[in-house]
Amino acid sequence: PFDVETDFVPVAPLIDVSNVLTINPNVINVRNLKEFVDEIKANPGKYNYASTGNGAGTHMAFAEFNARLGLNMVHVPYKGGPEAITSVLRGETCCIMNQVQTVLPHYKSGKVRLLGVTTAKPVEVIKEVPTIASSGLTGTKGFDSSIWFGIFAPKGTDPAIVAKLGQAVREVLELPEVRARFESQGNAIRIETPEQFKKTVHNDRLKWAQVVKDAKISID
């Protein structure tokens, strides 16, 4: 076992990966987030939501959402992304909070409906889909449940090397062609200094620890 804050040195984040509330309209025929919440509240325990596994980002995002809004849904964990999204397409579950790049082809083909993205800002490739935080619903203010990827170095790495690596990463991420490539997949560039990234890691650990506790999440 290891501790990400004591055994590694944060170098730089790379991208924020947004999840999006994705529904099968043949199972739950609603057109916006308010209708979704009203339907779930009117039928506690009726609807199942899929995730890519216990404790996965898709699970954590929905767990936080349900806890904030007081929703009673049944969690159905699958062993990975393909099984989870397939369950929604088949109507075995009503919905999932999955990565934009995963659901995008199904959205474009009309098989699923997208109700809200989990990031604080809209996602470039699906700008027509509002953020959950902007819905105005009680409990959604400030909602930001994104996944990020970043680069770390081993504990004890020379700070000068960490700073140089971080600067190199930021310069690459700021290239227009790199930004465009990530945005086309539903992701957003994240620019932070090593010190800022260190704070992000610490704050997110505290946040998700509380979500795990409140939602009584266990890991397989």
Question: Model features per residue range: what roles?
Answer:
Residues 62, 88-89, 107-110:
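Hydrophobic residues within well-ordered alpha-helices
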Residues 53-54, 76-86, 90, 99-102, ...:
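Short helix-initiation/N-cap motifs at beta->coil->alpha
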Residues 61, 81, 98-103, 117-120, ...:
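Beta->alpha turn/N-cap motifs
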Residues 43-47, 71, 89-98, 111-114, ...:
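Alpha-to-beta junction loops
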Residues 9, 36, 111-123:
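Conserved helix-loop-beta element of the AMP-binding
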Residues 1-83, 132-137, 142, 148-181, ...:
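Hinge/capping helix and adjacent helix->loop/strand transition within the periplasmic-binding protein
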Residues 193-219:
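Extracellular/periplasmic bilobal clamshell ligand-binding domains
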Residues 32, 77, 92, 99, ...:
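Conserved functional loop/turn residues at catalytic and ligand-binding sites
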